[in-house]
Regions:
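Conserved acetyl-CoA-binding loop-helix of GNAT-fold acetyltransferases
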Residues: 75-76, 82-99, 115-123
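Structural motif
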Residues: 3-6, 101, 124-125
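GNAT-family acyltransferases
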Residues: 1-79, 96, 142-168
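Short, structured loop/turn "capping" segments at alpha-beta junctions
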Residues: 66, 102-104
Length: 168
């Protein structure tokens, strides 16, 4: 079981309804559907020894056409903080986003006070591009987000060119 939230970004304990096998299967099937539609790609991170869910990373709202971009997000449960899991997952997802999904740009929105996520983003080559004021509704209020982004060229991966529509 997870401990109570450690700060405002920590999701803390989950209710039994969120942890059931049927609910987990439902989430996985929904994610498979979004992946088939080229809209969402995710990685789950598990501890090697215990098999415990450590966290995850996602490419969300994939944009094709002129943008060839996606939003990048991640989370790590508090018992696993400061062990490198987040960095390993986000690094892998950046590589997948550029090499396998064929994206050109990835963007993360990070709350300005979330120093650990900012350090993680910068350590992987994301640069700060600005601030979106009152960008998302979290914890019952509108929250500002720092905009951090990386392109495939920034990390030395050649862009594959415009994605061709997949047959449906």
């Amino acid at each position: 079981a997870l401990p109570p939230p450690q700060n405002r970004w920590d999701r803390g304990r989950r209710g039994p309804e969120e942890l059931s096998r049927p609910r987990f299967r439902e989430v996985l099937e929904h994610q498979r559907k979004l992946r088939r539609e080229d809209r969402f790609y995710s990685l789950a991170v598990f501890e090697r020894t215990s098999g415990a869910l450590v966290g995850g990373a996602s490419l969300m709202d994939v944009m094709r056409g002129l943008a060839q971009a996606a939003f990048l997000g991640w989370f790590v449960h508090s018992p696993f903080w400061r062990r490198g899991y987040g960095k390993e997952a986000v690094r892998a997802l950046i590589d997948i986003g550029f090499r396998d999904v064929g994206l050109h740009r990835l963007e993360a929105g990070i709350e300005p006070e979330n120093r650990r996520s900012i350090l993680l983003a910068r350590s992987l080559g994301l640069r700060k591009e600005g601030l979106k004021r009152r960008a998302v509704f979290l914890r019952d209020t509108w929250v500002d987000l720092g905009v951090y982004a990386v392109t495939c060229e920034d990390v030395g991966i050649p862009w594959k060119g415009m994605a061709k529509p997949s047959p449906r």
